[in-house]
């Protein structure tokens, strides 16, 4: 979708300016013809001295399988003593649909133990991912700044005592995961812990939420985004300077974040047609008899909200792909949210920010239009020069440049001011296209979700009409073929925008209306 927008905009600019504003009309008698990632040293996991003693732990024996429910202001999570894994997680502030009775967004929902998330495996220590843990917890209900902990403990057949602790805060999506091992055996053990996440592949054709879908990893100071389809070729692995790994769609994500260099490697693999697994490895651990070690992570399950992700640290906000113009998209999104705080309507906020951008760029637009007018006045003389030097292109170019110099006209004066605005356009496009704030946000009348297409296609059609009017107001000296090409652009844009988010169409529509008003004013203010 984004590629189509880029191509269409570049095409329209090229046609508008290259033919109608700069070059003279054609004369009838003159035809111008991933590979393996290198290994790197990883920082050691935080060691716990041998004087640190874990609580007395029962052997697994007949420990029963139980579900423990954690309810906060933001989500409801269900953990199982089977693997001390995450069985279900539901976001309380987001719905699957915008209408009444919509179900809450479910990020995890599994019944089979081997498909739980946040399972821990350590074969060298005898830790199996689906072992049944002991827990004295009975669930948690937290609000505001309240904190609570779920603790799970188990002893492996090798004599390794293992404890998993999940720490929650009532008003935060962050979950702190602390894992501690104690070697109660007379034998030294060496190895790594693996934290396993199972991600169900459930992309639905036509569902805007899954336009962006798959793993994202920040490794070696670079965002690595993978498509689910690419894993049919084999797994992906990262093992250098990993800050976090995540699985995301357009609006929501889950992530495992490093805590004190606790991620040594990440392996991503498609285990079957329905699941993609991330395997997060700790740095090497060496446990002498009586010694302990800890491996900690930060866990995130929640919305891809710019401010929320930034608050998690570790550059997690970079999971939102704002493209090349991220430095512009982020402040534009914050500005949009600022206006929403006063209007309580993102549609009105979009209109306000569009008006402000038009006012800011008015001097450039005025200069551009004035330059185009001056270029038009020179068209007859340029045609004469072209006829005069039709057999000597170099001489013609020199004569044209002398003409520009004599009349103090910059041939790029009409284009450059418009080119300056292109980064702002694409930045705002990205901000609107991938903003969770617009998800299920109503505007007015029939538009009840600015992240979804206009259900009756009214705004795209009106947008196409305004493009046609705007085109007619732009003076040109095109031949019939070029004129037909230009007439096709509004039609192409209209069909292209039929399935675009209505918030983005609203921006373009308002921008077109303001451009028409602006051109009307400039036409009246400039001499003929």
From Swiss-Prot:
**Keywords carried by this UniProt record:** Cell inner membrane, Cell membrane, Chaperone, Membrane, Protein transport, Transmembrane, Transmembrane helix, Transport
Q: Which CDD domains match?
A: 5TM_YidC_Alb3, EcYidC-like_peri
Q: Output the GO biological process annotations, alphabetical, semicolon-separated.
A: protein insertion into membrane; protein transport
- How is the protein disposed in the membrane? Multi-pass membrane protein
TM ranges: 5-25, 346-366, 416-436, 486-506
An MF annotation (GO) of this entry = membrane insertase activity
Please give the Pfam families that the UniProt record associates with this protein: 60KD_IMP (PF02096), YidC_periplas (PF14849)
Q: Where in the cell is it found?
A: Cell inner membrane
The Gene Ontology CC terms held by the record are: plasma membrane
What are the cysteine partners in each disulfide bond?
none
Main subcellular location of this protein, as a coarse class:
membrane
Highest taxon listed in the record's lineage: Bacteria
Describe the protein's quaternary organization and the partners it interacts with. Answer: Interacts with the Sec translocase complex via SecD. Specifically interacts with transmembrane segments of nascent integral membrane proteins during membrane integration.
Function comment: Required for the insertion and/or proper folding and/or complex formation of integral membrane proteins into the membrane. Involved in integration of membrane proteins that insert both dependently and independently of the Sec translocase complex, as well as at least some lipoproteins. Aids folding of multispanning membrane proteins.
Q: Which family does it belong to?
A: Belongs to the OXA1/ALB3/YidC family. Type 1 subfamily.
- Protein name as it appears in the record: Membrane protein insertase YidC
Q: Which organism is it from?
A: Geotalea uraniireducens (strain Rf4)
């Amino acid at each position: 979708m984004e590629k189509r927008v880029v191509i269409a905009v570049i095409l329209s600019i090229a046609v508008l300016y290259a033919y109608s504003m700069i070059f003279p009309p054609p004369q009838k008698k003159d035809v111008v013809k991933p590979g393996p990632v290198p290994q790197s040293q990883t920082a050691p996991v935080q060691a716990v001295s041998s004087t640190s003693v874990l609580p007395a732990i029962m052997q697994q024996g007949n420990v029963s399988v139980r579900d423990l429910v954690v309810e906060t202001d933001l989500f409801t999570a269900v953990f199982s003593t089977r693997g001390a894994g995450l069985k279900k997680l539901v976001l309380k502030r987001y719905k699957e649909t915008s209408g009444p009775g919509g179900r809450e967004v479910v990020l995890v929902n599994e019944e089979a133990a081997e498909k739980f998330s946040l399972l821990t495996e350590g074969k060298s220590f005898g830790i199996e991912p689906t072992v049944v843990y002991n827990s004295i917890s009975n669930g948690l209900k937290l609000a505001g700044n309240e904190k609570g902990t779920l603790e799970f403990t188990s002893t492996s057949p090798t004599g390794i005592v293992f404890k998993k602790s999940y720490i929650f805060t009532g008003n935060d999506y962050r979950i702190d995961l602390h894992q501690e091992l104690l070697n109660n055996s007379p034998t030294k053990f060496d190895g790594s812990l693996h934290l396993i996440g199972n991600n169900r592949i459930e992309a639905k054709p036509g569902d805007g939420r899954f336009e962006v879908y798959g793993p994202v990893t920040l490794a070696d100071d670079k965002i690595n985004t993978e498509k689910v389809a690419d894993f049919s070729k084999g797994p992906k692995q990262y093992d250098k300077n990993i800050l976090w790994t995540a699985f995301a769609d357009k609006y929501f994500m889950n992530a495992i974040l490093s805590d004190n260099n606790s991620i040594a490697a990440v392996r991503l693999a498609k285990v079957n047609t329905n699941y993609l697994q991330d395997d997060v490895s700790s740095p090497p651990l060496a446990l002498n008899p009586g010694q302990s070690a800890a491996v900690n992570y930060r866990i995130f399950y929640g919305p891809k909200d710019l401010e929320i992700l930034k608050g998690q640290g570790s550059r997690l906000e970079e999971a939102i792909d704002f493209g090349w113009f991220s430095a512009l998209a982020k402040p534009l999104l914050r500005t949009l949210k600022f206006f929403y705080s006063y209007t309580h309507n993102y549609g009105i906020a979009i209109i306000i920010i569009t008006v402000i951008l038009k006012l800011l760029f008015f001097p450039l637009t005025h200069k551009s239009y004035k330059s185009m007018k001056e270029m038009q006045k020179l068209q007859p003389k340029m045609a004469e020069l072209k006829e005069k030097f039709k057999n000597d292109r170099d001489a013609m170019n020199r004569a044209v440049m002398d003409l520009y110099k004599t009349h103090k006209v910059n041939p790029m004066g009409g284009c450059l001011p418009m080119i300056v605005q292109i980064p702002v356009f694409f930045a705002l496009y990205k901000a609107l296209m991938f903003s969770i704030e617009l998800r299920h946000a109503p505007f007015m009348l029939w538009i009840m979700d600015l992240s979804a297409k206009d259900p009756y296609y009214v705004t795209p059609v009106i947008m196409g009409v305004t493009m046609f009017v705007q085109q007619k107001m732009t003076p040109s000296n095109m031949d019939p073929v070029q004129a037909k090409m230009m007439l096709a652009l509004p039609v192409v844009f209209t069909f292209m925008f039929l399935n675009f988010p209505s918030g983005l169409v609203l921006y373009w529509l308002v921008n077109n209306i303001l451009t028409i008003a602006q051109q009307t004013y400039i036409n009246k203010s400039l001499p003929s």
